[in-house]
Amino acid sequence: MDRIGLGSNILREINPKLIYIAVSGFGTKGPMADLPAFDHVIQGLAGFTDLQSSDENPFDFIKTFICDKVTAYTVCQAATAALLARVTTKKGQHIDISMLHACLSFMWPDGMMHKTLKDDDRFNMSPGSDYFQIINYKDGGVAVAPLTDSHWEALLNMVGYPELIGTPLYASLASRMTNMDKVMEVLKSPRKDIGVDKAIEILVTADVPCSPCSSRDDLESSEQIKAIGALETYVTKAMGKLTVPTPPILFEGKETSQADASPLLGEHSRSILHELGWAQDTINELINSGELKITEI
């Protein structure tokens, strides 16, 4: 950005209240500082691909652009905090955020649970990744999050292992949390194929947190997703008919809607310059010279 005259020092000299956020892949120091970074690369370096390991794959991706999105959320948090600070200080600031640091911080609390406590005499947790196991039936999968003794009693009865109730491995939260890989093993092979609907009925009755595993093809027809208004469909000039999530933050007394697609490059160039008081002749000269991009819809 310095090369094109848009560096932090240059712009903040013009406007001391400017909040300038610089996002990098690996940070501004170290042997990888100047290397290109994309989501896949950060997933690998930050431990996400190890987190997703299985018996079949020692390393695997989380199959969504999670590192891009985590970094974006981190930038939003930083910008919001800096804006609030500026109310008091009347000053802007320069903020550096690396994808690697943001994603390592995101993954660490549960993904590195077993590496957080360094003293041998402290309570040693199982890796958080060991806590995830789907119960698979012929007609689909069930996601469960058993925590309490009563949850596990209901769950062990449901998957057909009542003889394990009260055994040392399952008897206490402490035992379960330190042996999570062994504890969750029974969910891989339920002794009866009772099906998803019956499993959900049993778990809900026992107050065990659970849900059926949705196919992505079924999300638009989900009654719960419809109930909270999480998706909307509208028509745009450029892209035609779209179905997208509505903004998930619900402010009191306000309807939430995406309302329209993101603008195309140059779609609002003319109107922005008009708003800034630029003469139409000057705008036309910039368009004709190729210096200003205009997209007419």
Task: List each model region and its residues.
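Beta-rich nucleic-acid/ligand-interaction surfaces
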Residues: C103, N179, D218-S222, I294
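Amphipathic terminal alpha-helices
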Residues: D281, E285-I297
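Flexible, small-/acidic-enriched active-site or ligand-binding loops
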Residues: V235, M239-E285
